[in-house]
């Protein structure tokens, strides 16, 4: 059993992107467990209103090789934006929040299940704004990565967030070996669905 982002599972199963020349055909997704949401955060007084406004700015794209960085790169490239268009900073979640708070960067990305503790903490100390994606930007991302899906961050999720924010979500899936016994797969799936409230 493993828990993985579905884009990574898709790449490994199809032998594409990071899994070129090392395809893994004997895996199956047993269930979608919860979604990560790409969250782009800046300070409320920032002039950044869309992903296009990131050009020329200092932007955290997540820790090197992280799911955040992979998701962000795919999202931006699908919308004609490359790392050469801004100053990418490879910071983890807490470092990103601290750097936004201290004015060391202009914006930062998170790809994680919301609400996110580091964003909650940042919103408690500074006025922040989450940046919405346009419907076209979401569609462009979906065309690039089959497992990307529209996702809405609910109004009020973070202090000062008065409106819902449109973004993309990436399911985290429970991955198993293709040879897993069918009865065991059934029992695991039943256990998950019978305990969703827990």
Segments the model singles out, each with a brief description of its role:
Residues 193-198:
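Periplasmic-binding protein-like
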Residues 1-63, 130:
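Short, glycine-/small- and polar/acidic-enriched structural segments
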Residues 51, 64, 68-69, 73-79, ...:
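Acidic/His-rich structured neighborhood in mature extracellular/periplasmic domains
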Residues 56-60, 89, 188:
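Short, well-ordered beta-strand elements
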Residues 6, 16-17, 46, 82-175, ...:
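Pocket-lining segment of extracytoplasmic ligand-binding domains
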Residues 183-191:
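Short amphipathic alpha-helical coupling segments at ligand-binding clamshell hinges
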Residues 22, 79-84:
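Short helix-capping segments at alpha-helix termini
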């Amino acid at each position: 059993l493993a828990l993985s982002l579905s884009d990574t599972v898709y790449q490994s199963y199809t032998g594409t992107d990071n899994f070129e020349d090392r395809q893994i055909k004997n895996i199956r997704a047993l269930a979608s467990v919860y979604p990560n949401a790409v969250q782009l955060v800046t300070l409320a007084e920032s002039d950044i209103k869309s992903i296009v406004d990131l050009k020329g700015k200092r932007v955290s794209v997540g820790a090197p090789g992280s799911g955040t960085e992979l998701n962000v790169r795919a999202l931006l490239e699908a919308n004609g934006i490359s790392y050469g268009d801004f100053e990418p900073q490879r910071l983890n979640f807490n470092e990103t929040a601290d750097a936004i708070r201290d004015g060391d960067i202009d914006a930062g990305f998170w790809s994680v299940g919301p609400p996110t503790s580091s964003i909650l903490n940042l919103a408690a100390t500074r006025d922040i704004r989450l940046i919405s994606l346009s419907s076209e930007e979401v569609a462009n991302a979906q065309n690039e990565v089959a497992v990307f899906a529209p996702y809405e961050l609910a109004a009020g999720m973070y202090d000062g967030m008065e409106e819902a924010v449109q973004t993309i979500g990436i399911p985290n899936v429970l991955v198993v070996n293709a040879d897993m016994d069918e009865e065991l797969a059934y029992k695991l799936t039943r256990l998950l669905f019978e305990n969703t409230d827990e």
